[in-house]
């Protein structure tokens, strides 16, 4: 059976190669895996090396559970993956590559015992050419050594803000090309870079830069053809460039185009995508081909006024997203990515900060198609060691080159909440800014910290200044957001400012009506009602101040933090609007959906705060379909008032009956009746002693 399988696979590869010059196939099935800790190097101890392998398919992580259930009790270290693969003689004269989309965190790849490449960093892709190490007509062993132990020279330098899951947690691809190709190993990028200038409704100047590589010892007469197609596949324009490709390193070739009356990429309103196909031809035959998206758009930030897309004011309703899921860790399929994006679209968000690292390229591609405006960043976070500068630059270069053609990306994130020593952090941030501008002069850069004053030395080292402000949670009172933004607006009107994180934790098992204006996050009680109160007020302030160019609530989903134990749940950040398992949407989710989305929303809050503490209470309704009617035990209540925004409705001094109370709200919109209903239980007055003490300190990176 094994020989039959090899023959079938060999025939299949041969058939594929005869049909297409470049073949990209999944390399994710049938891996063997073993995890440490190891008392000795298992590669050097035959008995240890040959025993106890587990069969796995990729994506895979060894931390799917232990990083999520107990604080500081997870495995970080080495894991090995092995895969035996037959490569037929028909590959003679071809070039063979392996492309890894993401391995946590530091990787060595071996083919038949030979080291073919090393990579440092958990979140960017990397590609190695393996052809010279292969034995054609035979089985070959691919071995991957992954290590997610923290290192001072690789960012992130710790697991403090989020866990770096170990393993080959994103897909792997086998790539086969001719000797002359569009380069595969330029930081694992597509090898094609599309830039746009002078974008308007009248015209746009498009430049397509292609990097070619000759893997032989002979110059080749070739033709490079770059063609732009409409979304429906109709050819718009094309350019052919005859060339002689020498075998002396990667060569760069450029085609320029002017698109007249281009169909613009207009965010969620109209995310129109052209397609650019770069083809390499020899003797009239296509020997390589790469397809990339082209969304024709122009981003502009005007201090004090807002964000503009193609000259039109564009609302920046922002959320953030960590990539891990409960029970899966970071080993996600496209199904999980699509689910997360569906929730982000449903809430009405227009922009996403994918934090705090490069995320799946599939995710960025979907954002291109959905019209979401994207912030992409590197994991330079939390702490510095003085040894990470080279790796930070490497990861930024990889992020930019791999993600260069995504029209959804408007900004490159350089750092997040990196503190002492300030001079080192500021200097490295400036270096990263300069690198980003060299690689991509047309996009913005941003750096982020928790210092809320512009004159701090780590500020003002990028195009955009991001500030994480957790008023009422980590610092001061939740209402202090307004004097903060007013002060900056008056003192620094020229500043491009974004509120890059804000919010509060919410454990759904914790509920209360007794709410102050600040919560002691060091205690274990994290009520959902305080999170709701925080978002209600703070979004209302943000919405009134265009000086805040964009705001990004923290976070769309609860996520794992393996070094934490807070709010009654170990290894968890509870600031999400949706629970870690993606099953429950918190009240705050519907607050933003009512404010942002065009879909009808009618929602009663505090549905989990069932056991009421007060006989005289209030009822809150979110409605973007007009003033709702509210009923208590079948009787209509009067005196409804407008709250912080025009979707916020409050009824004060509602008197509950002893026992079960049914609250119902009704609204009619476009001839359709909408309803929502919840139940509360009142059994007598209850007093709660809670620590609502105000934190006088400035937020500094928790």
Model-derived segments and spans:
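Extended substrate-binding grooves/exosites of carbohydrate-active enzymes
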Residues: 55-69, 149-152, 161, 165, ...
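Beta-strand-rich binding/interaction modules
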Residues: 111, 201-244, 251-253, 617-639, ...
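Extracellular and select intracellular beta-sandwich modules with Ser/Thr-enriched
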Residues: 168, 237-239, 253, 287-291, ...
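Signal that preferentially marks extracellular ectodomain short beta-strand elements
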Residues: 128-134, 254-271, 651-654
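Extracellular Ig-like/FN3 beta-sandwich strand-entry sites
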Residues: 137-139, 203, 219-221, 250, ...
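Accessory beta-strand-rich segments of carbohydrate-active enzymes
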Residues: 32-37, 76-185, 189-191, 215, ...
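Short, solvent-exposed loop/linker segments at the N-terminal edge
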Residues: 196-204, 609-615
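Bacterial Sec-dependent N-terminal signal peptides
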Residues: 1-23
